[in-house]
Amino acid sequence: LRPEEIASRIPDGATVALAASGIFLEADAILEAVERRFLETGHPRDLTVVHALGIGDGADSGLNRLAYEGLVRKVVGGHWSWSPRMQKLARENLIAAYSFPGGAISSLLREIGAGRPGLITHVGLGTFADPRVDGGRCNSRADEELVELCEFLCVLEGRERHP
């Protein structure tokens, strides 16, 4: 498929997961096609973008291609440094912005790809990602609870063990 065809298949309100690091493995031709389609037609709009690592060159490529009010509604990212325009949207409260550990996001994407319902991990407890702290929220527009604290009862050798 050509980048334009891929961009045309992204519906309004879709969740798009991106996998790259800086400019390495960046699907810039596809991101450019999505940007061009939005600027020409106003679609797709209200996307949720998920990325584990920083994507782009810090100027025009990567997540910066998606940094338009209306194109993106929510970003869940592990590293925002390479996308100053997306950072600006988050700072101005024009998108819901969340940040979680990059490894946890990568593992979550693997779980989703395998058809499993989510990720259970201790990573992030006691940090900004902990639901008892900020729950990964970076601004006031980020009003959803994307993570939750779970407690488990372990039964080993017929006896209950509490962590």
Regions found by a protein language model. Name each.
Residues 1-163:
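Conserved alpha/beta enzyme-core scaffold
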